[in-house]
């Protein structure tokens, strides 16, 4: 991916003169080496980005809004690998521009438009991810395929409007062409200050914005992953499995139910048989407050009554946290043919402790009750699995964005630092250093597909299936 041709403005003119002067010193072996290396990089870039685009096209698992932005970035990288790399290699090897003014202007326009579109795609990816993690309730509703297409189109159209007319028609605006026929640079970038201004707008400012956004993305993503992380063994052990603490609900006074009925409880997604509690009656029983909510296939509701776990002094207005009560089993009307799921909320101090009971009407009614309980257990397990999948997606997307931004910064920084230095010292940078720095910008287009594969296992598997012609396995790659 490149954003500047190394031959633009006064710094570009200096580079062109150095290229021309050094050409006579290039030996045949040196030119063959340059052609081999750059040709190989061009081939890898083209193949890699075609794989990216095909993977998103054929694998439905990869057809997400975020990957559509990567598809657009892959298009830009493909153009860089197919055209810009090879034309610049020709310029370096021959030491002059041999293709004339028209091809020169078309190359520069294509190079700048595609490079600017790449930067804007990176900004879109960063902003998209930032809004996803900071506005998870409102932004996803507007994050549609149509919206992604409009944003991608806007990035390309804006890049074209900013660069193509100025590069192609500036000579007609000023009335003459000042670029020699054997050289190729942008005419309106006539001094180092202007070149540095374009570097600020096209590189330094986007890098600052993307870095700040990524810091916020990383912090918000870690917070969400930690929030939805499944409980560990220690956390589960410290928590009473049959009870869930909830805000205090409106109490209602009940009486203790008769004992003797069997009971099942839903605990952490598993159906367990709870033994009948053995709780001796307290010396001075005081009515407890509890709330009972039931649901059953017969739409019946019955009250639940509890035996108080401890006695209260009438002189106390408030009481410290009481021990969690043991729920008493309850019986139903023998004539009822429906089993019920009972949710009992027990007040302990300023909290409520809630448990779920499955109460059979008759032994024959145990089966439907167990089926309902298993359904609830399945729902609980699905929720845990979804939380784990969401955490995995968060990490995967964040890693991919980090890799892309890191590759962009590492490969584009050397050239743009040289642009800054050249503003104050036009003879401080050797010609070969200019060429290497500019080629690093192109190498970014080679690295991006590797970033996708290393950070996303689905991309990696789809790449492998495409390369091995295992087309039947592509749809199952996850």
Curated annotation (Swiss-Prot):
The chain crosses the membrane at residues 31-53, 68-88, 106-127, 148-170, 193-215, 401-421, 436-455. It is a multi-pass membrane protein. It comes from the Eukaryota. Glycans are attached at residues 8, 13. This is Muscarinic acetylcholine receptor M4. GO terms for biological process: adenylate cyclase-inhibiting G protein-coupled acetylcholine receptor signaling pathway; chemical synaptic transmission; G protein-coupled receptor signaling pathway, coupled to cyclic nucleotide second messenger; regulation of locomotion. Residues 310-332 have a biased composition (Low complexity). Belongs to the G-protein coupled receptor 1 family. Muscarinic acetylcholine receptor subfamily. CHRM4 sub-subfamily. Residues 54-67, 128-147, 216-400, 456-478 are cytoplasmic.
């Amino acid at each position: 991916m490149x954003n500047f041709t190394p031959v633009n403005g006064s710094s570009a003119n200096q580079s062109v003169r150095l290229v021309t002067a050094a050409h006579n010193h290039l030996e045949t072996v040196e030119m063959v080496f340059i052609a081999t290396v750059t040709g190989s990089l061009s081939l890898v870039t083209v193949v890699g980005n075609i794989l990216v685009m095909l993977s998103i096209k054929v694998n439905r698992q990869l057809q997400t809004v975020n990957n559509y932005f990567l598809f657009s970035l892959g298009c830009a990288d493909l153009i860089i690998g197919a055209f810009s790399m090879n034309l610049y290699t020709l310029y370096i090897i021959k030491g002059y521009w041999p293709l004339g003014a028209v091809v020169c202007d078309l190359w520069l326009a294509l190079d700048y438009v595609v490079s600017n579109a790449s930067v804007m795609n990176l900004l879109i990816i960063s902003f998209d991810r930032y809004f996803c993690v900071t506005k998870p309730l409102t932004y996803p509703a507007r994050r549609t395929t149509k919206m992604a297409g409009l944003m991608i189109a806007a990035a390309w159209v804006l890049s074209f409007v900013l660069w193509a007319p100025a590069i192609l028609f500036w000579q007609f605006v000023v009335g003459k062409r000042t670029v020699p026929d054997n050289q190729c640079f942008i005419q309106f970038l006539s001094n180092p200050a202007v070149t540095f201004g374009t570097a600020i707008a096209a590189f330094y400012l986007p890098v600052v914005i993307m870095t700040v956004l990524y810091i916020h993305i990383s912090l918000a993503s870690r917070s969400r992953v930690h929030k939805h992380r499944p409980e560990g063994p220690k956390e589960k052990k410290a928590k009473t499995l049959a009870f869930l603490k909830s805000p205090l609900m409106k109490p209602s006074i009940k009486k203790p139910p008769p004992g003797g009925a069997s009971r099942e409880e839903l605990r952490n997604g598993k159906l367990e048989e709870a033994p009948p509690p053995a709780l001796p009656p307290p010396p001075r029983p005081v009515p407890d407050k509890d709330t009972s909510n039931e649901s059953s296939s017969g739409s019946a509701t019955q009250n639940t009554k509890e035996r108080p776990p401890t006695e209260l002094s009438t002189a106390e207005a408030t009481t410290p946290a009481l021990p969690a009560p043991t729920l008493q089993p309850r019986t139903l009307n023998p004539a009822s043919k429906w089993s019920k799921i009972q949710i009992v909320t027990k007040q302990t101090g300023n909290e409520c402790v809630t448990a779920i009971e499955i109460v059979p009407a008759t032994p024959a009614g145990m089966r439907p009750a167990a089926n309902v309980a298993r359904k609830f257990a399945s729902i609980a397990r699905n929720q845990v699995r979804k939380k784990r999948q969401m955490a995995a997606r968060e990490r995967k997307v964040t890693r991919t964005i980090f890799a892309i931004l890191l590759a962009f910064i590492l490969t584009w920084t050397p050239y743009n630092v040289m642009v800054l230095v050249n503003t104050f010292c036009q003879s401080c940078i050797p010609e070969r250093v200019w060429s290497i720095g500019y080629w690093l910008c192109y190498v970014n287009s080679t690295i991006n597909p590797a970033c996708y594969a290393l950070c996303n296992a689905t991309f990696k598997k789809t790449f492998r299936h495409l390369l091995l012609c295992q087309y039947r396995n592509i749809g199952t790659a996850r």
